[in-house]
Amino acid sequence: MQTPPVKDGPRINDEIRVPRVLLIDQHGEKQGEMPTASAMEAAEEAGLDLVEIVPNANPPVCKILDYGKFKFQEQKKKNEARKRQKVVELKEIKLRPNIDSHDYDVKAKAMHRFFEEGDKVKVTLRFRGREMAHPELGMKLLQKVKADFDEVAKVEYEPRMEGRQMIMILAPR
């Protein structure tokens, strides 16, 4: 024996089993509290559906409307909300301790663009060969980055050595 499928969404027409409801007509006007049967008749006369909008109110609030259209509008709202949602990405900018000023400016411009888009930026400073003997140069460069982006970004992960590279993560304010 199978159980009936669980219906999601509001109850409509015959699925509304409460004795009395608070009715709102198709024009959005409050009709007051009435027996469910009367509300069903009013919906039938209008050629529309009786939809339970607020089921946990006392009495439940029902509205006369076209259920197909209502479902479509709800789906549209959900899709719009999903579209507006921004996924924060982690972008990476790779630097070297002895970076030239113009190269630094180009990287800084890219970082500004990432912050405007609302993304986090991971600044990776890679050391090669003898550069490992001077981690203070790398720290100085990352402090410069931190100071340059103080107004638009906050430090989420302080500069730290990880193997042959120094890493810092900045997030937009």
UniProtKB/Swiss-Prot annotation:
<comment type="subunit">
    <text>Monomer.</text>
</comment>
<dbReference type="GO" id="GO:0016020">
    <property type="term" value="C:membrane"/>
</dbReference>
<dbReference type="InterPro" id="IPR001288">
    <property type="entry name" value="Translation_initiation_fac_3"/>
</dbReference>
<dbReference type="InterPro" id="IPR019814">
    <property type="entry name" value="Translation_initiation_fac_3_N"/>
</dbReference>
<dbReference type="Pfam" id="PF00707">
    <property type="entry name" value="IF3_C"/>
</dbReference>
<dbReference type="InterPro" id="IPR019813">
    <property type="entry name" value="Translation_initiation_fac3_CS"/>
</dbReference>
<keyword id="KW-0396">Initiation factor</keyword>
<keyword id="KW-0648">Protein biosynthesis</keyword>
<dbReference type="InterPro" id="IPR036787">
    <property type="entry name" value="T_IF-3_N_sf"/>
</dbReference>
<dbReference type="GO" id="GO:0043022">
    <property type="term" value="F:ribosome binding"/>
</dbReference>
<dbReference type="GO" id="GO:0032790">
    <property type="term" value="P:ribosome disassembly"/>
</dbReference>
<dbReference type="Pfam" id="PF05198">
    <property type="entry name" value="IF3_N"/>
</dbReference>
<dbReference type="GO" id="GO:0003743">
    <property type="term" value="F:translation initiation factor activity"/>
</dbReference>
<comment type="similarity">
    <text>Belongs to the IF-3 family.</text>
</comment>
<dbReference type="InterPro" id="IPR019815">
    <property type="entry name" value="Translation_initiation_fac_3_C"/>
</dbReference>
<protein>
    <recommendedName>
        <fullName>Translation initiation factor IF-3</fullName>
    </recommendedName>
</protein>
<comment type="function">
    <text>IF-3 binds to the 30S ribosomal subunit and shifts the equilibrium between 70S ribosomes and their 50S and 30S subunits in favor of the free subunits, thus enhancing the availability of 30S subunits on which protein synthesis initiation begins.</text>
</comment>
<keyword id="KW-0963">Cytoplasm</keyword>
<dbReference type="GO" id="GO:0005829">
    <property type="term" value="C:cytosol"/>
</dbReference>
<dbReference type="InterPro" id="IPR036788">
    <property type="entry name" value="T_IF-3_C_sf"/>
</dbReference>
